[in-house]
């Protein structure tokens, strides 16, 4: 209770308190209210105050404003008053003035009256009108006076009027009077004036009438003259065509008389007859012109040589020798027209005059040659002698050739299976026109030669000595006559005696000489590097050791093959040294010429290089190819003839000049060599001294050839690449030394350097070879040391001012030398390059060569010495191949050496690592940041010595270590560029050299510089070895990626571990990056050497897998490699063959490219010839590849696999995957290679262009068409090039590289075209495997021989590609660092990617894109274009090869990827260009995604090529392609469509075709497209996606594809072989038909290649190529069995169809494309755009900065065509667009690159739609072909969106109408259009004159074929 109360109380209290508070609360509330009211009042008062203030303010303001108004008014009033006063004053003044005027008027009136009186008097005096006329002048004078007076009067009157107006009131009356008076006077004046004017008019009218009459008369006269000229030209064309057709008929009759083997005999006979005709005519006309001076000498030397080589001639190689004898001339003279068909085309188009003009000379020379031959015949079998005596030159030639062919056939049969013989020798022979002569013979010789070689080992010293004397003697001749040189070099190379015999023949017939040489070399090499793998495998295995033992002789012969006697031990070394020296001296003389007048040297170098190139190509190609392998040799040989003939004239002049210096040089070198030679002879096998001596001597010799090759390479000796590398080195070193000697050019040591340089150049080049040779004898360390010291000594001697340290000498010395050379070169060469992009081809080539070659040579040589030393055992044979790849020594030896050095050369490796370690070891370990100081050297050195490390080297070289991660794939790009440069060395290297100059100038130069150097090095090392180079390029890109990303780990892991895996495996793994190069080279050497290497390490497995891959890769890499690869491939099986094919293709591309720069250098106008030469060489290489491939039906797969395995690093693990993935990997590799393609692109472009030229004499860029017969391989090489270019774009992954590529593309537009040509060429070559290779060439040009050769892509990209994932990932890492998958994984991914068009293309495309992106730089743009085109081409081709459908998918994907890469890297290229490129790329991606699936239809591509040729077909093809592309890349395609106009149509077409595509293809394509699209935004992402996503698809597809490809290849082998012979023009058709889908693909590729070539600058070749393309197209469509007959029939049909379609497409193109053809199809008149192809359609073509962007599209749009090409084709990019852009091509490739680029692109399109044989594939391919044209257009579009647009449309239309035929037709059209350019015109005319009908038919046929399919 209490508690409650208390609570209540509390509550109450609370309430109380509450109440009280309430009261307070209430009060407070009131108070608050009060306060609030107060506040409100205050607020109101404040407001009132404010308002009042405001009012006051307003009032104040008003008042102030009023005051202001007042002031204003007052002011105004004052002013008015002032004005009033002024006006009054003025009035007064006016009044005064008026008075004055009145006075003046009076005076004027008086004057007028006087004048009137005078006039009256005058008129009266005039009397009659005649009198008046007579006095008209007086009257006129008077009239003028009157007019003046009147004027004055008028002025006065005006003044008066003014005054009067002013003073009107006061002066109105006076003014009126004055006015009246003036009016009267004016009237009188007017009347007089009218009278006077009437008289004057009468006079004028009469004068005008008279002038008009004169003009009419003059016009009529001019028209009559023009008509007469046209008629004359037409007559010549027709004559040449008749001649060609007669030859073809002869061949066909023979072939029909005899089947397979008889066929092969007959083919040989046919070749022989053609050789006789061409050799005697062409070679005589050109070579004999040169030789006339040295004829007696040559005869004497030949005779002498006969004596020396009688035994050899009588050796198994005798048959080959004789053909060689016959062929060399043909090779030399009709290098452009490698075959009669080629000759006819070329002659009819551009070289006709040569053939025609040379007919008398030919007959005379023929008799001389026949006399020579008779002399030789005395030693030769009686069969040869009697024909020579009895028959006329042509008949004698024919009988000789036939006899030789028969004997070769017999020997071949003995040495290798008839199929191998027929396929290889014949296919080689057939594939390249030269190849027809040299490759087939090569194979025969080679095949039979191993015994000779082995037997010769006993007398290498003897023979070499004799040969040496002969060489010395014959050196001049050799200079004059590549045959002689080839023979001379071949003699040392070919088992001394056999080689001698070959040499003898070579003297007579460079082609056959070195063909036989090559064959013997190859044979010897083959025995060592199994050329006929299966049967030669044991030989190879036993021969490998033998070769190892023989290494001094065989290895040396390989080296010597490359270098001449070098490879044959000391005797051979001496001989070759002499030859090489002689050659090199020639080269050096040329170089000196070059050095002396940088510009002239460019020409001289071009000519001299060409001469050397031809000669060295003959010799070096003969040797290099023999050395490196028949394929390579063929390749080389093909280029040799190609170059020989185009360069023959220049060559002839320069040969004399060079000969003089050459003799002197020869003496110097010989003395140096002899000083070392006796030692070499005595101590070659001894080891250290030998190394030193040999290095000095042999290296000098090899250096000569290599340097020359390199030199030549940059100057367009694609086939001389190996030699170019060696010769280039020697050339450059010697050039430097000679220059120092003659013109202390770069190096300080003039005399020592002369001697040492001669030594050193050769030593470095040879030393690696010798070390390779010695390597077997020596320890790696010893050799390394020996090499190190020898090279060091040499280098120190050479580079007295350079770093002397030996350890550094190798790395640093090399670097020093390289810096010296590179610095010299970069400073002088690069600067020169930079400043002489135009001069760059020759000068850049030269400087680059000097930079690259000299330094590279030193570098390479040095690294080579150590590298080879280290890797000699492996490289022993390979080095031989490497020897021709001496530059690639770094690559091959570098790769091998690097692993070897890494493993074996522990001490040296650091040195080498610094120098080659920078390249190889450092590359492996790291980009070799240490070398960065000597980076330029390192670049050169590393690329040179370690092509695998080349990327590292490249990046190391140019890039800083920090750049290594970036450089790896930059390096891959660079490496790719390097390799590509080598691949497209002539154009690319040259371009790239320039481009590297540019690159060096630019930040990209880090990459590009390595690129140039890498190009130089890659090109030098990998240059000729297309395999080696390719390998190197391959390796470098691969290594670069692997090495770049996992720098040491991947590279070393791959390089060292895999190197450990058997050095071949290392070659395979490092080969993925480094061994790839090695492998490539090994494929070349390891084909023989690979086995040797692998024998050394794991002969069987490396041989099969490692070696097979490596050698195959190398084979792929190099033609020579191809030969061994063939042998090797045969033993290795498909893989070897595949890789060989790849290598071969690579060499083809490489060679072509090498040749291309020469072409470029020579002149963009003669690109056709050169391209044809290059194409021929490439074709040879391709032929070798084709042979290799046909030999291995699964060769494409095998190659791919080998490439893939190399790529994968796990030969076995990837063996199957490789097989399946091999293709994709090749694609990947090609991509990296394509990445390598910055240079490779160019080279590829060049290759493509060359290929196209070979293929299409008519269409320089479409080489493959005419050269189809012998350019099938070329076409493949072409394809390879095409593919390579696209491959390059991947490498282009790094923006820099891409810029570089583009830069090169501008320069190597040829390269691009060549790449495409290579791509197309490759397919033609190996319809199945070659197709794959071609596709890889296209899609991953490097991936396949096509890639490696066409671009580094084939080998480089192949290596790259085969290390593509590795390399690609590395390349891709720049795009997406994370994408860098473990090399193996990445490789597998790449493989899978390769297998999955999407994945592979994505990877390839992206890297290609990157590459392209890199090339977007104006310098690289064409290359980039090339690269993209190539990348896509490789994709397309790879897919085509791998899986036509897949290719389709892959190609599109590659396109997309490339586009992505391009887009990603586009910023690198000029914004506009980049944008254009991006558009193009998108377009291309669309088209390519669609095209990818149609890649399988690459064969139809030739149709677009033809259309491109004609410039009217392309739009259609692109439309078709567009459809496919649309499916995958509708958006991109739409953009393209906007850009290309026909894009939509293409897209629709593509869609339709794509729908038709197999679902797998579609899926893959879609995936690829998706991936591509993904990658479009993030390149890396796309690649990553593609890698991860499409690997399986690609893998599956690849698996499927290889199988398809295998059978097609097998079919292709025989039928293609026959067809090639039968249809030199129809060469593409043969493989295509046989290959079926693959064949179609190949054919398309070929055609596309032709197109690309056309664009690139081989418009002429392209035209001819397209002629052949259309033929091949028809042929391809024809069943394999009926291939021979139907090839011709189809050819006619195709041509007919092409004519109709051509016209139709012409119309379409006229409306849609920029290129317009007359209905007659006479010529493609580029629309303003087309004319601007370089500028407009080919915006990126010239340098294709946008090319890089469209580079992927390039694949579709042929942008890859050259421009590096420009860049490349870089192109260095054969495509339909090529055809459409021939003018551009001619302009830009002629300006060289644009056309090439366009061509490269177009061939891709062409290729895509090409496969008409496979219905779905055909349509798809048509679509693909269309995208290619689109790409080409894109490429052009980069340059000129409008131009590009019409091109794709054109391509689309062609694809749609008759993709195959139309593509060829487009090519023809383009060629005709391209014909607008100088060479293109020539070839275009040929293609059009002879090929127009064919093209039209082909196009027409294409439509029916398409319908059929």
UniProtKB/Swiss-Prot annotation:
Species of origin: Homo sapiens (Human)
Subunit structure: Interacts with the SH3-containing region of the adapter protein NCK.
Region (Disordered): 351-370, 736-819, 855-997, 1026-1469, 1486-1509, 1541-1592, 1725-1750, 1763-1885
Identification of the protein by name: Nck-associated protein 5
InterPro entries: NCKAP5_C (IPR032769), Nckap5l (IPR026163)
Biased composition (Basic and acidic residues): 736-748, 1241-1250, 1547-1560, 1567-1576
Keywords: Coiled coil
Annotated GO biological process: microtubule bundle formation; microtubule depolymerization
Extent of Low complexity compositional bias: 1110-1131, 1178-1187, 1339-1366, 1454-1466
Annotated PANTHER family: NCK-ASSOCIATED PROTEIN 5
Compositional bias of kind Polar residues: 753-789, 950-965, 981-990, 1066-1084, 1300-1325, 1428-1446, 1869-1878
């Amino acid at each position: 209770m209490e508690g409650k109360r208390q609570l209540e109380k509390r509550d109450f209290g609370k309430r109380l308190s509450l109440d009280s508070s309430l009261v307070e609360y209430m009060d407070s509330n009131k108070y608050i209210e009060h306060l609030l009211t107060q506040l409100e009042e205050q607020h109101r008062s404040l407001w009132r105050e404010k308002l009042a203030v405001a009012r006051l303010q307003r009032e104040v303001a008003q008042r102030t404003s009023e005051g202001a108004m007042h002031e204003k008014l007052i002011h105004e009033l004052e002013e008015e008053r002032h004005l009033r006063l002024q006006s009054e004053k003025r009035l007064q003044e006016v009044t005064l003035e008026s008075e004055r005027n009145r006075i003046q008027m009076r005076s004027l009136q008086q004057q007028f009256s006087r004048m009137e009186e005078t006039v009256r008097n005058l008129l009266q005096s005039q009397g009659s009108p005649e009198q008046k006329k007579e006095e008209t002048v007086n009257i006129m004078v008077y009239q003028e006076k009157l007019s003046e007076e009147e004027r004055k009067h008028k002025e006065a009157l005006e003044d008066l009027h003014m005054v009067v107006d002013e003073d009107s009131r006061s002066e109105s009356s006076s003014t009126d009077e004055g006015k009246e008076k003036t009016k009267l006077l004016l009237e009188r004046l007017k009347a007089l004036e009218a009278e006077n004017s009437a008289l004057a008019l009468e006079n004028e009218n009469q004068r005008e009438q008279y002038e008009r009459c004169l003009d009419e008369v003059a016009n009529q006269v001019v028209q009559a003259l023009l008509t007469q000229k046209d008629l004359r030209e037409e007559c010549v064309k027709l004559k040449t065509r008749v001649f060609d057709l007669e030859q073809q008929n002869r061949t066909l009759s023979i072939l029909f008389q005899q089947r397979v083997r008889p066929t092969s005999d007959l083919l040989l006979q046919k070749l022989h007859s053609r050789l006789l005709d061409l050799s005697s005519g062409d070679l005589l006309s050109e070579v004999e012109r040169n030789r006339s001076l040295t004829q007696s000498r040559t005869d004497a030397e030949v005779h002498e040589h006969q004596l020396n080589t009688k035994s050899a001639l009588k050796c198994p190689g005798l048959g080959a020798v004789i053909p060689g004898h016959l062929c060399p001339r043909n090779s030399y003279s009709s290098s452009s027209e490698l075959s009669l068909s080629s000759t006819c085309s070329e002659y009819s188009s551009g070289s006709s005059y040569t053939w025609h003009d040379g007919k008398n000379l030919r007959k005379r020379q023929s008799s001389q040659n026949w006399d020579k031959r008779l002399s030789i015949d005395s030693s030769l079998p009686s069969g040869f002698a009697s024909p020579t005596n009895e028959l006329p030159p042509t008949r004698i030639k024919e009988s000789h050739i036939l006899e030789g062919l028969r004997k070769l056939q017999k020997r071949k049969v003995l040495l290798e299976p008839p199929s191998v013989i027929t396929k290889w020798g014949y296919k080689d022979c057939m594939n390249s026109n030269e190849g027809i002569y040299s490759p087939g013979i090569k194979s025969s010789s080679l095949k039979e030669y191993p015994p000779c070689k082995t037997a010769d080992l006993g007398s290498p010293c003897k023979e070499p000595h004799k040969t040496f004397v002969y060489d010395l003697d014959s050196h001049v001749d050799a200079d004059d006559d590549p045959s002689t040189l080839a023979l001379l070099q071949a003699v040392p190379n070919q088992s001394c005696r056999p080689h001698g015999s070959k040499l003898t023949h070579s003297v007579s017939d460079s082609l056959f000489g070195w063909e036989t040489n090559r064959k013997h070399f190859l044979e010897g090499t083959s025995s060592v590097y199994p050329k006929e793998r299966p049967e030669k495998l044991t030989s190879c295995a036993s021969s490998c050791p033998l070769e190892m033992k023989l290494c001094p002789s065989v290895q040396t012969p390989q080296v010597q093959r490359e270098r001449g006697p070098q490879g044959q031990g000391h005797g051979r070394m001496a001989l070759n040294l002499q030859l090489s020296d002689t050659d090199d001296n020639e080269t050096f003389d040329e170089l000196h010429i070059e050095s002396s007048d940088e510009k002239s040297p460019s020409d001289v170098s071009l000519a001299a290089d060409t001469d050397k190139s031809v000669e060295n190509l003959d010799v070096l190609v003969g040797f290099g190819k023999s050395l490196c392998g028949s394929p390579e040799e063929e390749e080389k040989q093909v280029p040799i003839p190609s170059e020989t003939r185009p360069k023959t004239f220049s060559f002839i002049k320069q040969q004399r000049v060079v000969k003089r210096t050459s003799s002197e040089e020869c003496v110097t070198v010989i003395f140096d060599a002899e000083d070392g030679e006796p030692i070499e002879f005595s101590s070659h096998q001894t080891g250290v001294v030998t190394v030193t001596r040999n290095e000095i001597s042999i290296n000098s010799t090899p250096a000569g050839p290599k340097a020359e090759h390199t030199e030549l390479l940059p100057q367009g000796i694609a086939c001389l690449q190996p030699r170019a590398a060696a010769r280039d080195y020697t050339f450059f070193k010697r050039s430097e030394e000679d220059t120092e000697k003659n013109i202390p050019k770069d190096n300080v040591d003039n005399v020592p350097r002369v001697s040492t340089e001669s030594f050193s150049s050769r030593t470095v080049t040879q030393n690696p070879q010798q070390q390779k040779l010695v390597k077997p004898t020596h320890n790696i360390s010893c050799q390394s040391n020996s090499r190190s010291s020898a090279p060091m000594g040499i280098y120190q001697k050479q580079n007295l001012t350079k770093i002397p340290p030996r350890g550094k000498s190798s790395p640093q010395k090399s670097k020093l030398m390289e810096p010296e050379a590179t610095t010299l070169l970069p400073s002088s060469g690069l600067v020169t390059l930079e400043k002489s992009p135009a001069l760059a081809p020759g000068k850049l080539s030269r400087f680059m060569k000097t930079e690259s070659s000299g330094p590279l040579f030193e570098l390479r040589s040095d690294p080579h010495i150590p590298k080879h030393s280290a890797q000699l055992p492996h490289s022993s044979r390979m080095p031989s191949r490497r020897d021709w790849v001496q530059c690639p020594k770094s690559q091959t030896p570098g790769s091998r050496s690097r692993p070897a050095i890494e493993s074996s050369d522990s001490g040296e490796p650091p040195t080498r690592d610094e120098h080659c370690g920078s390249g190889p070891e450092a590359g492996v370990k790291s980009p070799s940041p240490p070398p960065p100081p000597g980076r330029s050297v390192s670049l050169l050195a590393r690329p040179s010595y370690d092509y695998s490390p080349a990327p590292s080297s490249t990046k190391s070289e140019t890039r800083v270590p920090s750049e290594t991660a970036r450089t790896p794939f930059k390096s891959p790009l660079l490496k790719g560029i390097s390799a590509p440069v080598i691949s497209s060395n002539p154009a690319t290297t040259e371009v790239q050299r320039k481009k590297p100059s540019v690159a060096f100038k630019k930040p990209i130069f880090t990459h590009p510089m390595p690129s140039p150097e890498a190009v130089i090095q890659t090109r030098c090392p990998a240059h000729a070895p297309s395999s080696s180079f390719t390998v190197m390029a391959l390796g470098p890109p691969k290594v670069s990626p692997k090495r770049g990303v996992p720098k040491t780990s991947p590279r070393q892991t791959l390089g060292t571990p895999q190197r450990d895996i058997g050095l071949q495996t290392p070659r395979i793994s490092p080969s993925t990056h480094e061994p790839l190069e090695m492998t490539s080279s090994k494929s070349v050497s390891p084909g023989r050497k690979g086995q040797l290497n692998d024998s050394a390490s794991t002969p069987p497995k490396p041989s099969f897998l490692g070696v097979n891959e490596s050698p195959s890769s190398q084979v792929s890499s190099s033609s020579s490699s191809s030969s061994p690869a063939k042998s090797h491939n045969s033993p290795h099986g498909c893989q070897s063959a595949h890789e060989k094919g790849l290598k071969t293709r690579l060499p083809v591309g490489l060679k072509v490219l090498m040749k291309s720069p020469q072409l470029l250098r020579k002149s963009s106008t003669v690109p056709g010839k050169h391209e044809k030469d290059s194409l021929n060489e490439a074709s040879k290489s391709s032929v070798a590849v084709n042979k290799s491939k046909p030999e291995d039906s699964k060769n494409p797969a095998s190659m791919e696999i080998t490439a893939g395995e190399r790529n994968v690093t796990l030969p076995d693990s990837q063996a199957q995957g490789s097989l399946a993935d091999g293709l994709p990997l090749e694609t990947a590799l090609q991509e990296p290679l394509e990445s390598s393609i910055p240079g490779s692109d160019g080279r590829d472009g060049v290759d493509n262009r060359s290929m196209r030229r070979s293929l299409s004499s008519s269409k320089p860029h479409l080489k493959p068409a005419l050269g189809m017969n012998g350019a099938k391989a070329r076409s493949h090489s072409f394809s390879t090039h095409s593919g390579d270019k696209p491959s390059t774009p991947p490498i282009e992954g790094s923006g820099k590289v891409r810029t570089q590529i583009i830069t090169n593309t501008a320069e190597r537009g040829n390269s691009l075209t060549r790449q495409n040509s290579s791509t197309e060429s490759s397919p033609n070559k190996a319809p199945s495997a070659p197709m794959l290779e071609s596709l890889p060439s296209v899609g991953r040009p490097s991936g396949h021989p096509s890639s490696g050769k066409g671009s580094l892509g084939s080998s480089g990209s192949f290596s790259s590609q085969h290390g593509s994932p590795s390399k690609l990932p590395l390349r891709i890492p720049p795009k997406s660092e994370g994408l860098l998958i473990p090399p193996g994984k990445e490789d597998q991914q790449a493989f899978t990617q390769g297998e999955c068009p999407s994945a592979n293309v994505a990877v390839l495309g992206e890297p290609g894109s990157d590459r392209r992106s890199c090339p977007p730089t104006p310098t690289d743009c064409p290359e980039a274009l090339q690269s993209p085109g190539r990348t896509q081409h490789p994709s397309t081709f790879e897919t085509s090869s791998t899986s036509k459908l897949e290719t389709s998918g892959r190609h599109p994907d590659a396109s997309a990827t490339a586009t992505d890469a391009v887009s990603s890297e586009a910023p690198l290229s000029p914004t506009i260009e980049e944008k254009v490129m991006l558009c193009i790329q998108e377009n291309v991606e669309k088209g390519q995604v669609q095209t990818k699936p149609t890649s399988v239809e690459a064969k139809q591509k030739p149709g677009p090529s033809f259309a491109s040729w004609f410039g009217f077909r392309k739009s259609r093809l692109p439309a078709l392609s567009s459809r496919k592309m649309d499916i995958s890349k509708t958006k991109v395609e739409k953009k393209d469509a906007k850009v290309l106009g026909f894009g939509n149509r293409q897209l629709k077409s593509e869609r339709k075709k794509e729908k038709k595509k197999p679902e797998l293809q579609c899926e893959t394509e879609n995936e690829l497209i998706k991936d591509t699209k993904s990658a479009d935004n993030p390149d890396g992402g796309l690649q990553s996606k593609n890698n991860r996503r499409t690997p399986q698809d690609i893998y599956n597809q690849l698996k499927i594809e290889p199988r398809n490809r295998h059978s097609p290849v097998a079919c292709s082998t025989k039928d293609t072989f026959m067809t090639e012979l039968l249809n030199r023009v129809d060469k593409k058709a043969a493989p295509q038909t046989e290959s079926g889908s693959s064949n179609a693909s190949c054919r398309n590729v070929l055609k596309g290649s032709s197109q690309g070539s056309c664009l690139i600058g081989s418009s002429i070749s392209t035209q001819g190529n397209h002629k052949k393309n259309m033929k091949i197209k028809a042929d391809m469509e024809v069943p394999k069995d009926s291939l021979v007959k139907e090839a011709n029939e189809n050819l006619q049909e195709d041509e007919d169809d092409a004519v109709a379609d051509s016209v139709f497409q012409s119309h379409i193109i006229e409306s849609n494309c920029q290129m317009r053809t007359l209905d007659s199809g006479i010529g493609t008149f580029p629309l303003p755009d087309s004319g601007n192809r370089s500028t407009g359609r080919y915006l990126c073509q010239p340098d294709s900065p946008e090319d890089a962007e469209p580079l992927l599209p390039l694949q579709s749009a042929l942008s890859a065509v050259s421009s590096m090409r420009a860049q490349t084709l870089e192109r260095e990019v054969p495509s339909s667009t090529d055809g459409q852009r021939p003018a551009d091509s001619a302009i830009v490739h002629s300006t060289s690159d644009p056309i090439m680029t366009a061509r490269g692109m177009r061939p891709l399109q062409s290729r895509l739609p090409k496969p008409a044989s496979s219905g779905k594939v055909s349509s798809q391919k048509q679509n693909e072909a269309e995208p290619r044209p689109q790409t080409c257009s894109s490429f052009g579009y980069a340059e000129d969106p409008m131009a590009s647009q019409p091109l794709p449309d054109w391509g689309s239309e062609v694809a749609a109408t008759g993709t195959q035929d139309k593509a060829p037709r487009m090519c023809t059209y383009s060629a005709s259009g391209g014909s607008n350019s100088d060479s293109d015109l020539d070839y275009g005319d040929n293609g059009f004159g002879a090929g127009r009908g064919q093209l039209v038919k082909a196009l027409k046929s294409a439509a029916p074929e398409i319908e059929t399919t």
